[in-house]
Amino acid sequence: MAHSRARRRKRASATQLYQTCKASGTCPPDVIPKVEQNTLADKILKWGSLGVFFGGLGIGTGSGTGGRTGYVPVGSTPRPAISTGPTARPPIVVDTVGPTDPSIVSLVEESAIINSGVPDPLPPVHGGFEITTSQSATPAILDVSVTTQNTTSTSIFRNPVFSEPSITQSQPSIESGAHVFISPSTISPHSTEDIPLDTFIVSSSDSNPASSTPVPATVARPRLGLYSRALHQVQVTDPAFLSSPQRLITFDNPTYEGEDISLQFAHNTIHEPPDEAFMDIIRLHRPAITSRRGLVRFSRIGQRGSMYTRSGKHIGGRVHFFKDISPISAAAEEIELHPLVAAAQDHSGLFDIYAEPDPDPVAVNTSGSLSSASTPFAQSSLSSAPWGNTTVPLSLPGDIFIQPGPDITFPTAPTVTPYNPVTPALPTGPVFITASGFYLYPTWYFTRKRRKRVSLFFTDVAA
């Protein structure tokens, strides 16, 4: 059978033993010297301190805090302590009042000695100036002048005709009978001169600016940042990128689906776009037309959705898609212009239009004067019929397609003319035939067509 050893109990401290055993005289031999600081170490310090002075180093059996002032470097003077608290005022000595002291304090009066019948001593008076007085029986004559004063009188008249009924007490009229002096309007009595003043700013119109040197306001254009390191540059060669970029991302079915004008795309499954450069594109921003290195560039910024988190956020890079439209030439190219009037022998640019000639054409004898090359109207038909065929020469560039114009019908002119026929003399030089029976408006030369306007910027998602 194993014997269990008794647990050792902890001994009480020396201070606790000293408090209980000092009176009974049963203290252990090491308790009293330790508490009363009478050990061998304490005795050595006491004997050594008689011949050696250590100052305020705080060497002793206590804690090593360096005394009240603390430890300082050897050979240095400690700084004086500056108290930051409020300064205490000296106490006022107050006499204490005991319970047996009387509560009534008698007034102390000084004793005064009154001598009855004895005059008060006067201070000595030194001699001063002598004053001589004389008496005269002649009365004094005073010069009194009469002064004139202007008296101001005030009279108050109450007239109920001019008083308003809503006012209980109207202001009475005051008339003054005093003299009123009016000073001249000018300070100097000399003659004055009128000096005209010049007007510097007449108006604030464009012809007369409000400032001396008007500076036009400059508006800073926002920087697009299409060529930063955060964007992947991709050049697109398909021309559909300009008009319908959605065809490069998804396949459209015009039979069952209408035209998709939205530029946001949702891909539920893995798919392959028509163009591999537009893989995982979920958004295309609005287009921007810029010029870079001598080229006109059409740009769009796309957002890829390569990865989705559980919260629904997508993670993907941004791509800058661009396509160069046309180069910008450094110098202007020379364009050859065609003549406006065609030659007489060139009949490729002639158009026939119906016009009403003069009712009574002038008869001209052209037996030997007119030739096929004399005038550009050699191929025109000159007749006296009410309707004639007039040929107008026109010259068009080579890249414009010639289309026949409409027939223009004019109202029939009266057959009676106010002009009498005149028989001219034989011509001696070239003959020019001019007609004055109609006026051909320039817009009737060509057929007016409607142009279909195409917007440069397409519907886009706000960036």
Swiss-Prot record:
Highly phosphorylated. It comes from the Viruses. A motif (Nuclear localization signal) lies at residues 1-12, 446-454. One of its GO terms (biological process) is symbiont entry into host cell. One of its GO terms (molecular function) is DNA binding. Coiled coil: none annotated. The keyword DNA-binding applies. It is found in: Virion; Host nucleus; Host early endosome; Host Golgi apparatus. GO terms for cellular component: host cell; host cell endosome; host cell Golgi apparatus; host cell nucleus; viral capsid. Belongs to the papillomaviridae L2 protein family. Minor protein of the capsid that localizes along the inner surface of the virion, within the central cavities beneath the L1 pentamers. Plays a role in capsid stabilization through interaction with the major capsid protein L1. Once the virion enters the host cell, L2 escorts the genomic DNA into the nucleus by promoting escape from the endosomal compartments and traffic through the host Golgi network. Interacts with major capsid protein L1. Interacts with E2; this interaction inhibits E2 transcriptional activity but not the DNA replication function E2. Interacts with host GADD45GIP1. Interacts with host HSPA8; this interaction is required for L2 nuclear translocation. Interacts with host importins KPNB2 and KPNB3. Forms a complex with importin alpha2-beta1 heterodimers via interaction with the importin alpha2 adapter. Interacts with host DYNLT1; this interaction is essential for virus intracellular transport during entry. This is Minor capsid protein L2. It comes from Human papillomavirus 13. The gene is L2.
